[in-house]
Amino acid sequence: PEIFLTPGTGTEPDVSGDIVAEYIEMKQTYVNQSIGDAITGKTIRRAIYGNGVMYILAVDASKNPTLLAVDPTTHTVIAELPTNFCVVNSPEGYKLSDIALTSDGVLIGCSMDTVRNVSYYGSSDPWNLYKWTRDGNTWIGSKWFSRASNETAGNYYDAMVGSTIAYSGSFNSGTILTTAY
């Protein structure tokens, strides 16, 4: 996919050294339960609708994510999507902070993590993007993109990146916007 981190430049970022996607199949735990049973004790961070499915991202008190595909008519859980590949390094971050849909229906999400100015600090934790695809009744999740750079951090020396995301376009050709503060 084409990802442009610097608006208006039209140049593709250097992705050498980025993490290759690791595919993990889901394990079903909340399937056929009501939404209320599945999110009891959790805080909803985002709920979106697309592809005839409602997607709910909720986190528990330890910020561990639960990502559900829900039937919008019956309000029952169709699937719990895998999140065990989602990672975060900073204690104030989230393994999975937000989700969005591409115009061609691919579910994507991001971590919220501290990204530092590499030239100043010498190294940085990456900001991660994830994707989920559906093959029949099986959901497959993977790390899609991982990046640690000054541009990713909004040119701050030390920034929390990924509280929210917005995506415009298809999965293979789109624009990602995120927060850095």
Where do the protein language model's features map onto the residues?
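Entry beta-strands of beta-propeller and related beta-repeat scaffolds
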Residues: 52-56, 105-109, 171-177
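Beta-propeller domains
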Residues: 21-23, 55-84
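Short glycine/acidic-enriched loop and turn motifs that connect beta-strands
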Residues: 60-64, 113-123, 181
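Beta-propeller blade signature
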Residues: 67-72, 122-136
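Beta-propeller fold detector
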Residues: 13-34, 77-87, 138-151
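Beta-strand-rich domains and repeat architectures in extracellular enzymes and scaffolds
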Residues: 30-63
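Repeated scaffold domains used in trafficking and secretory/extracellular systems
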Residues: 40-46, 87-102, 147-168
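C-terminal edge beta-strand
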Residues: 2-9
